[in-house]
Amino acid sequence: MDEEMKEKEFINLENRIWKTYQSRIITATRLLNNSKLLDFYSTIYTICLTLLSVFTLINGDKLINYFSVFISIIVMGIVFYGNTMNYKDRYINMKDNYLKLGNLYFKCLNERINKNYDIEKIYEEYSNLLNTVENHSKYDYLSYRLNDINEKGKVPLLQKIIYWFRKTMLLILKIIIFVIPIFFVIVSFIRMI
């Protein structure tokens, strides 16, 4: 293989490593945010459940009892979901992986500066890193592409629309999940007065 072809192949591999590195950073951030969000929801729902229990003791209203049961089921679901998704451990593994990918990327830059293209060795290390942790999602890769100045213009309009639609729907869902227990507490408090 001539030197020019070797350099092009090496740059292509270097770009793949960079894209994977950036996508994994986005994935790790999403996993950490999901973990924090679940903790936040657990706290909000537990506080609201405690308030509903106190209202039930004071008032004994059946509707408040139903609200309490409903909130209890949601709390149980949140805890079960949080335990099965294991966001914190997945975040730690993903962060470790992207840090190693970052080191590999800088190793590539150094090899390119020195014109020492050990493609097989770099590719093997890259493949090993890909196999040590779950893959990033298509959504995370799309997030990378939409935030990268060189990739942004290459994303088709339909993918942009789907991305922003999903992002909007997730925000609406998060707001609804946040508002539900507060609504029940307010209604219960009004019924108590």
Region annotations inferred by a language model:
Residues 32-92, 161-193:
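Alpha-helical transmembrane segments and their immediate juxtamembrane boundary regions
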Residues 2-41, 80-83, 87-175:
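Conserved non-transmembrane functional hotspots
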